[in-house]
Amino acid sequence: MLLEYHTYHPINLRSGILRRNLSASDSDRLNQHVGGYRLEVVEPLRKIRMVLEETEGLAADLTWEGSFEVVQEQRHVMRQGTRVTLDAQRFAQVGTWSGSLSVDGEEIAVSPDTWVGTRDRSWGIRPVGEAEPAGRPADFDGMWWLYVPMRFEDYAIVVIMQEDGDGIRTLNDCTRVWKDGRV
């Protein structure tokens, strides 16, 4: 299952060969409640709850809890000439899910011993979403992106790498965080 919380709010659920998509939308990014879909911060940087009231045969009451402290990834800056095209940073965290899902009335138990997940939150300037400023648009020559958060018994590792279209590494970060918060 993929849960995303952006300006748009898609929920994607796949069961066997069936895939269901549900979107709720509101342009107010501070509003964590759209229709029957809401996100609650139970404990900052540790625990969140996602509730979907029955909508088109889907319902959920899920709690995500971080297994480790958040990992703050290094700042990522890309330029094209003197123009900054990307200046962003994020935090990532691995954890587990608990609660229940309902698909067309069938209840699915979600247990933290088998439902592992990750979350991240990024901020900054990115070449997506908003219109290009006036002037010549930046050329895009492609990129390679690797983002791998991993959870183990005693620690988590978050790997993030990016190369531009010429194969030049523009981001190279790997962080291990232990259960006691050591990095």
Q: Language model features by range: what are they?
A:
Residues 1-183:
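Structured soluble/peripheral alpha/beta segments that form catalytic or ligand/cofactor-binding pockets
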